């Protein structure tokens, strides 16, 4: 069955600040840097808006997720459920599992696993 989905990347100037992951070499860890963007609506409002426009699914970029707490993810899951919309993809647009720097490669792998754990309840 075919259906129409929209990616949050297509709306990246509407969802508020982008939460970019960067590598801090001296600390040997990831950090989040905010890039200001206008917020016309938030991620919790997106499922209902997308459904009203005829979409059946949303694909979310990790840098649009303002929070990975259990309560926020439960709210996000509820927003998708209430709208009757599918959360199809979580794009983790960061990490290099082929890095020659073992510390960085392990940190990137760990970050990916954290995102998989965060996406599971959503």
Question: Locations of the language-model features?
Answer:
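N-terminal pre-domain/capping segments
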Residues: 1-121
């Amino acid at each position: 069955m075919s259906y129409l989905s929209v990616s949050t990347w297509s709306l990246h100037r509407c969802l508020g600040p982008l939460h970019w992951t960067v590598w801090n070499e001296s600390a040997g860890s990831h950090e989040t840097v905010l890039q200001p963007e206008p917020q016309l609506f938030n991620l919790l409002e997106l499922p209902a808006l997308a459904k009203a426009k005829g979409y059946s699914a949303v694909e979310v970029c990790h840098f649009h997720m303002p929070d990975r707490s259990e309560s926020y993810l439960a709210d996000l899951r509820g927003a998708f459920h209430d709208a009757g919309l599918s959360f199809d993809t979580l794009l983790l647009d960061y990490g290099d599992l082929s890095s020659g720097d073992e510390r960085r490669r392990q940190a990137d792998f760990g970050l990916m696993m954290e995102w998989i754990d965060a996406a599971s309840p959503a």
